[in-house]
């Protein structure tokens, strides 16, 4: 298959050309001069109520008037249409990156005098700076060989070197190697508690805290480590020493907010570049590579967003159907960036963002606007999956169905030429399952039925849209996601099940208050409180415990799956779990882009890193 290797190995020309043709854009890259700043309109409060003409009969568009509360507008709107990127700068950045890669690559070679322990710590730095993908094959090969002598590597560490032992643990687990947490027993005293001499080792404590989040369901020592390190890191932040080490303090604050293993790789990179630059022993070549790489990615992201915004503007759904859905562009693209941030997945990010936008519109059709008869007719049309199926739908649902149909047909045309029709077959299956999940929830609400928590979770896992979005995630990856990947997904592995449960629970905690306000009582928290006779606060605490348990299950199942599933397939799965933490741990970051999500998006797509 023809592929562009200029900016990455898997950038598919045929897919990008078709994407650009549909948008009436050239398939060649255009990066005019980036504007010095992007202006964003101030957040406008939505009107409290919209009255629109709608239908209670699937074939009658004029039978009733219904009301709905519109979602708040996006903070970014269509502003990325005016953003422009310089092709010359892109090419120059890439040339500099390519020139630095051999220099950094040489640092991964043991023959240069570095021992396995030092190289492992260096890999941790590459990962944290967001540049490890440039050296992935070399890293995987090194760790595979080094794991054969992992005991010797640990023994070679000083008895009190908590920092290095924690880094080694993190790196090997990150790459799918099971390394026992018993290596941390050396840091315990005769009383069974962690030694007091560790209290003053701030770097070691931070690294140990990060390592504790790789724990599985049976590793109690890592649970102890999490409590121990969190306590002492919080004490450090309120002490005098924090004032003297501001860059370490900032990194600790970020870790306590969301640890690296639960954070998005690209967000970790942005934070860590600032930290690494202030380290007195930083490597200038590596720092330069990290900055060049991040700026290059930012420019590509801006170009992707411009392409996505152009598609949305030409689609023009806001003039065709009532705007009962969340009109979002930067947010779904942020999700797609969180799944795969590397440059070779540009076309895949755009397609995934489009899929997220579409799924959200369908979700809101069931949740906010459609009558029970209407959504039933939509489910039946999806089951038929025929362009003639629109005849029985009301006008606004004809638009929704046609948009869904066209997006899938676009992907179908792409994969059929590559003998990859099995990918679309799986995607269709998951779309139908998703529709049935949405319909079940709508019927519960229509009847005023409150299911048991167990019933709700069973259906709610399907209605997270996780399975259909995973299918859409892998389709644009081409041969990198073969038939074996889809057979694995179809087997419903414990890893993906834990992911969907975690996502459901995170979503429920973040959104139940807004759902209750609009009269949607069939949500996870409400089901749990009524069944178990507990308060909302107690239910949220229990959901948080369950979420943490699912994170451990994911860690556990990842280590098992890594033995036979490639890392480039497993990482997007893990990244969906990380998105749940980043976007929903402290509120609904998709509907209401609070300061944190706003800062994330701004740091990636607006404020270019200074070289």
Curated annotation (Swiss-Prot):
It is an enzyme of class 4 (lyase). GO terms for biological process: diterpenoid biosynthetic process; terpenoid biosynthetic process. A motif (DDXXD motif) lies at residues 363-367. GO terms for molecular function: magnesium ion binding; terpene synthase activity. Its cofactor is Mg(2+); Mn(2+). Belongs to the terpene synthase family. Tpsa subfamily. The Asp-Asp-Xaa-Xaa-Asp/Glu (DDXXD/E) motif is important for the catalytic activity, presumably through binding to Mg(2+). Involved in terpene biosynthesis in roots. Possesses sesquiterpene (C15) synthase activity and diterpene (C20) synthase activity in vitro. Possesses dolabella-3,7-dien-18-ol synthase activity in vitro. Catalyzes the formation of dolabella-3,7-dien-18-ol from geranylgeranyl diphosphate. This is Dolabella-3,7-dien-18-ol synthase TPS06. The lineage of its organism: Eukaryota, Viridiplantae, Streptophyta, Embryophyta, Tracheophyta. The gene is TPS06.
């Amino acid at each position: 298959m023809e592929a562009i290797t200029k900016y990455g190995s898997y950038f598919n020309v045929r897919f990008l050309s078709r994407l650009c043709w549909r948008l009436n854009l050239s398939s060649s890259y255009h990066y005019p001069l980036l504007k010095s700043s992007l202006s964003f309109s101030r957040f406008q409060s939505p009107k409290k109520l919209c009255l629109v003409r709608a239908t209670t009969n699937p074939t009658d568009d004029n039978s009733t008037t219904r009301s709905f509360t519109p979602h708040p507008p996006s903070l970014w709107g269509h502003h990325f249409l005016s953003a422009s990127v310089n092709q010359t700068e892109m090419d120059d950045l890439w040339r500099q990156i390519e020139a630095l890669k051999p220099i950094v690559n040489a640092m991964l070679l043991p023959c240069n005098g570095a021992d396995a322990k030092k190289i492992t710590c260096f890999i941790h730095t590459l990962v944290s700076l967001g540049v490890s993908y440039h050296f992935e094959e070399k890293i995987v090969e090194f760790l595979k060989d080094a794991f054969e002598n992992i005991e010797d590597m640990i023994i070679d560490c000083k008895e009190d070197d908590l920092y290095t032992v924690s880094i080694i643990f993190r790196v090997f687990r990150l790459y799918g190697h099971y390394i026992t947490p018993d290596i941390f027993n050396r840091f315990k005293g005769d009383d069974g508690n962690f030694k007091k001499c560790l209290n003053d080792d701030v770097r070691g404590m931070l690294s140990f805290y990060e390592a504790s989040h790789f724990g599985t369901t049976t590793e109690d020592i890592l649970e102890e480590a999490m409590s121990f390190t969190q306590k002492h890191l919080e004490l450090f932040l309120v002490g005098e020493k924090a004032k003297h080490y501001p860059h370490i303090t900032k990194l600790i604050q970020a870790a306590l907010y969301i640890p690296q293993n639960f954070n998005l790789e690209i967000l970790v990179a942005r934070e860590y570049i600032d930290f690494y630059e202030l380290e007195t022993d930083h490597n200038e070549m590596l720092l330069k590579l990290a900055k060049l790489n991040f700026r290059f990615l930012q420019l590509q992201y801006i170009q992707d967003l411009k392409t996505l915004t152009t598609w949305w503007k030409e689609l023009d759904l806001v003039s065709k159907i009532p705007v009962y859905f969340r009109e979002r562009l930067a947010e779904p693209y942020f999700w797609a960036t969180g799944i795969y941030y590397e440059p070779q997945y540009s076309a895949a990010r755009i397609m995934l963002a489009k899929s997220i936008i579409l799924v959200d519109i369908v979700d809101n059709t069931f949740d906010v606007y459609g009558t029970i008869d209407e959504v039933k007719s939509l489910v039946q049309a999806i089951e038929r999956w025929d362009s003639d199926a629109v005849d029985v739908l009301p006008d606004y649902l004809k638009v929704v169905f046609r948009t869904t149909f066209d997006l899938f047909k676009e992907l179908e045309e792409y994969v059929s030429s590559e003998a990859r029709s099995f990918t679309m077959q799986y995607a269709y299956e998951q779309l139908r399952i998703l529709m049935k999940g949405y319909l079940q929830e709508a019927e519960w609400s229509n009847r005023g039925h409150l299911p048991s928590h167990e019933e709700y979770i069973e259906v709610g896992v399907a209605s997270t849209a996780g399975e259909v979005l995973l299918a859409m995630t892998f389709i644009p990856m081409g041969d990198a996601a073969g038939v074996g990947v889809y057979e694995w997904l179809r087997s419903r592995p414990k890893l993906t099940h834990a992911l969907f449960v975690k996502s459901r629970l995170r979503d429920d905690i973040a959104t139940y208050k807004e759902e209750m306000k609009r009269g949607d009582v069939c949500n996870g928290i409400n089901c749990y409180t009524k069944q178990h006779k507990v308060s909302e606060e107690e239910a949220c605490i229990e959901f948080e415990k369950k979420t943490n348990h699912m994170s451990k299950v994911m860690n556990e199942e990842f280590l098992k799956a890594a033995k036979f599933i490639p890392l480039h397939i497993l990482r997007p799965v893990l990244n969906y779990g990380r998105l749940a933490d980043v976007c929903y741990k402290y509120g609904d970051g998709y509907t209401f882009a609070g300061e944190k999500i706003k800062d994330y998006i701004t740091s990636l797509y607006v404020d270019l890193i200074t070289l």
